[in-house]
Regions:
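Beta-strand/loop substructures that line and gate deep hydrophobic ligand-binding cavities in soluble
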Residues: 78-123, 128-130, 139-140
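Hydrophobic ligand-binding cavity/cleft-lining segments
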Residues: 1-38
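Hydrophobic pocket/interface hotspot
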Residues: 18-19, 28, 47-49, 62, ...
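Intrinsic-disorder/low-complexity, polar/charged segments enriched in Ser/Thr/Lys/Arg/Asp/Glu/Gln
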Residues: 3-7, 46, 57, 70, ...
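Structured surface interface patches that mediate subunit assembly and partner/cofactor docking
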Residues: 27-38, 118, 123, 134-143
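Hydrophobic/aromatic beta-strand elements that line small-molecule binding cavities or substrate pockets
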Residues: 7-9, 58-64, 85-93
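A short, structured loop/turn motif at beta-sheet edges
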Residues: 13-16, 63-69, 90-99
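Glycine-rich portal/gate segments that line the openings of hydrophobic small-molecule binding cavities
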Residues: 30, 36-77
Length: 143
């Protein structure tokens, strides 16, 4: 199995705002994709995201939601390489910033798709950072 791990520091951002950016429709559409259906943050809820030129949606079931500190998703729909992977977000306060750690685990191997996803998450985290630090909505995938 192959796993990826990222960390980003968000200056002047509190953990509640970082959590909201990861768990609400308004938050996710502010930095990730403009097409997201986010019914809620209860365990069992399914987030559905669409991306340009993708023939399917990415469906993430909420497996854990600890306000302002941790979110876990299980990918139950999407490209074959994503299904069955887990996306885990840890959020903590560090002085005047929030620190967000992203772990995406359970990939079958380190192949080209894995490498592409690794770079993609780095780009998404920079979009998240810009959204939270400036308040300007600019989803990476906007259509």
């Amino acid at each position: 199995m192959a796993d990826m791990h990222h960390l980003i520091q968000l200056q002047g951002v509190d953990t509640a705002d970082a959590y909201a950016a990861l768990t609400t429709g308004d938050g996710i559409t502010g930095w990730w994709t403009s097409r997201a259906d986010v019914p809620g943050t209860d365990v069992g809820d399914v987030l559905t995201m669409s991306f340009p030129d993708a023939p399917m949606t990415w469906d993430m079931r909420v497996d854990r939601a600890d306000p302002s500190s941790r979110v876990e998703w299980d990918c139950i729909g999407g490209p074959p390489g994503w299904k069955g992977t887990r996306v885990m977000w840890d959020i903590e306060s560090a002085g005047d910033q929030a620190v967000v750690r992203l772990d995406h685990t359970g990939f079958a191997s380190v192949d080209d798709m894995f490498r592409t996803v690794t770079v993609g998450w780095a780009q998404m985290l920079l979009s998240l950072k810009a959204y939270l630090e400036t308040g300007a909505r600019a989803p990476f995938f906007d259509f």
